[in-house]
Each structure stands twice: as structure tokens, then as C-alpha cells.
Amino acid sequence: NERAMSKVIEDKQREAGDGHDGTWVAHPALVPIATAVFDRLMPTPNNLHRLREDVQVKASDLLEVPAGTITAEGLANNVSVSLQYLAAWLSGNGCVPINNLMEDAATAEIARAQIWQWIRHPRGVLADGRRVTLALFRELLATEQRRLSAAMGAAAYRGGHFEAAAALLDEITAAREFQSFLTLAAYRQLN
């Protein structure tokens, strides 16, 4: 948790330094931390005086598909984050430290949306040349389940809603139509 808090402080310092007027936090307990950073780095009510003339953005830039590659590590990380977040959410926690970062539903949404999209998009190819497929996703999901079970112990794994989370993640990833929001599907697990 200490490393996660350090990362929160670092992120808020970057945001205030970039000229943001405010920020969001994943949990109400983080409000005092973010407030302290912004009070120190932004002593005025806003940053309207801080122009970013070093950044030139055109309308066409907003529609451009980003360049880059999909890495095996990135795909595996998306599977891990999605699984861990869903398991935590099903356990009643909406803000979770994962990989030393405080994560919430938005992070899991991005991760699972990328997985779903990469499986279906013609450019869904890993840097090593492999296609991102449902079978590859399922292989990575099973690997992550084994890794988590070994790391935390079988009893903790079983008690942590990981099996239900894995089944749900598989269901929404395999769905023909993109599911609007992962927690909507997760609510069915609670009833």
C-alpha cells in the first residue's frame, strides 16, 4: 500500500505540474493526499494562467488511431488486472491496489475492453506476430489463475471470488457484442 500511495502522490504532482485544475481519486481516503499536492503546487484557484503553448493539437489529432504495438506482457497484464479487479469487486472492494497502483473499475474497463477489441480487430496482433485470439486469452487467464492461487494459497484464492471473476471475464470477453459495463454483468453474480 505504501508504494501505491507514493504512486498516487507522483501522479497528482504530474497532474498539477501539467496545469490541471483538479483531479480524481479512486477512493475518498485519497482526497487529503491529492488536496495537499494541489494546494502546494497550485496556490491559485485555477491554472487558467498556465498556458501550454508547448502543445499543439489539431482536430485531426483527436481522431488518429494511436501508433504502437500490442505486447504479450501488455495482454497478460490486462488479463491480470481484469481478473484481480473483478474478484475484488465481487468481494465488496471497488478500489484495489494492483501492481502497486490504486485501481478502480475504470482501469478494469480499459483492460477488458482492449482484450475484447484486440481479439476482434484486424490489427489485434502481438509484437511477436501471434494473433490475439479467444484461445490465447483463455490460456493467459488460466495461467494467471494458477499464478494467483500459488501466490496467495489455495484457500485464500478460493475465498477471493477468483473462480467467479474468471468465469465472468471469460463470458464478457467471448460475447459477440461488447458488454456496456463490466460491473453490470458482475451484479448478476451478487444476486
Residue ranges: model-predicted function:
Residues 1-191:
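Expand to "…catalyze enediolate/carbanion chemistry for C-C bond making/breaking, isomerization
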